[in-house]
Structures are given as structure tokens and as C-alpha cells.
Design a protein with these regions (language model features):
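A short, charged, amphipathic alpha-helix used as a generic interaction element across diverse proteins
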Residues: 162-177
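Charge-rich, low-complexity N-terminal segments
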Residues: 1-77
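Acidic, glycine-rich loop-and-strand cores that form catalytic or ligand-binding grooves
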Residues: 65-122
């Protein structure tokens, strides 16, 4: 087995010359400290924090002079991150004809065991039932009409992504922000602490 000696300067030059996002990821994984991978609108996986999203978009980091509620600040940050994850060329537009598919981020704030260990009042507040359009609340909402179940996406378009992969990344990479945005008066699962 041969050993190669590569200087940091050579790695930096190779990184600048790499044309594909995949090549840059490989170089970064092999040679770079995590901080050296700069956030870019060309590769959504370089957006790892809210600050990365601001940097990639060229926007200032939000400072709250008005003491807004934490869930509002979290939503504002999620919207910024969503725009950064869309990338440079993607401009989502609502599609009234339904010809486009957008993916809402998915994640789990509680494990199955944590839900099972909740008392009935906590579980009832977490998962609600529908009173025919009058009482949908909580994080999950159960519907029963002409079929045994119905799934619906009634809100949150600006947080959607154009691929399932990006939506999964958005939900899991930024799970703490999602928890802050959605938890209201709940304590989220222990694994997020």
C-alpha cells in the first residue's frame, strides 16, 4: 500500500476545481474539516444550520428586538432554510391543477414508546379527531369519511420541497427548529434534548 502526501493548499485547489457536487462531497469527506464546506445554493446538503441558510442566501441573521414568541422565530427560520434548500434555480409556485408534487418535511418528535407513556389527556391533545372541519388541532388529525382514513395537506406550502429526499433532509436535519415551531405547550421527546 502506498501513502500519498497532499497539502491543504492542494486539497483547497482541487475543491475549487471540482465541478460536480458529488466530487466536492467526496473531497470534503476525505480531507476537509466540516467547517470548510461552505453553504451554497447549489448543494442543499451544505445547508446544515439556519446560519448556513442565511449565508447561502446572502441574508442577515435574524435578531429579534421585539421578543417574539419562540415558535414564530422558529417558523421564520424554517422559511429561510426552506428557500435555501430550494436552491438557486427552483422557484416553487402553487399549482391549482395539481400537476406538480411537492413534499412536506417529515419527522417524528416523539417515539412510539413516548406516545404510549403519555396520559390520556396528553395523548388526546397531541392527536386530535376531526369534527367535520370544526376541531382539527394537535400534530396529528384523524379523519373518517367515506373511507377508513384520509390524509390531507392543507397548509405549509412555503415549507415544502420539490423532492422527497430534500423534504426528509429538511425535517430531520432541522428537527429542533421543527420542534420549537410545533410544540406549543408540549415537551418534545427526550431524544431531542
Amino acid at each position: 500500500m502506498r501513502t500519498f502526501e497532499i497539502t491543504e493548499k492542494e486539497v483547497a485547489a482541487a475543491f475549487r476545481e471540482a465541478e460536480s457536487g458529488e466530487a466536492k462531497k467526496i473531497l470534503a469527506a476525505l480531507f476537509c474539516k466540516e467547517e470548510m464546506v461552505k453553504p451554497t445554493l447549489d448543494d442543499y446538503k451544505t445547508i446544515r444550520t439556519y446560519e448556513d441558510a442565511c449565508k447561502a442566501l446572502g441574508e442577515p441573521i435574524f435578531e429579534d428586538p421585539n421578543n417574539l414568541p419562540n415558535h414564530i422565530i422558529a417558523l421564520m427560520k424554517l422559511e429561510t432554510i426552506s428557500r435555501a434548500l430550494w436552491g438557486r434555480n427552483f422557484q416553487p409556485k402553487p399549482d391549482g391543477e395539481g400537476s406538480k408534487v411537492y413534499w412536506y418535511p417529515w419527522f417524528a418528535l416523539w417515539t412510539q414508546k413516548e406516545v404510549e407513556d403519555m396520559n390520556p389527556e396528553q395523548r388526546g391533545a397531541l392527536l386530535s379527531a376531526d369534527a367535520n372541519g370544526g376541531a382539527t388541532a394537535g400534530f396529528g388529525s384523524l379523519h373518517a369519511y367515506s373511507r377508513s382514513s384520509l390524509a390531507g395537506a392543507d397548509f405549509g406550502f412555503r415549507l415544502c420541497q420539490e423532492t422527497e429526499e430534500k423534504a426528509k433532509y429538511f425535517g430531520q436535519q432541522f428537527i429542533e427548529l421543527w420542534a420549537e415551531y410545533l410544540k406549543f405547550n408540549f415537551t418534545v421527546g427526550n431524544r431531542l434534548k
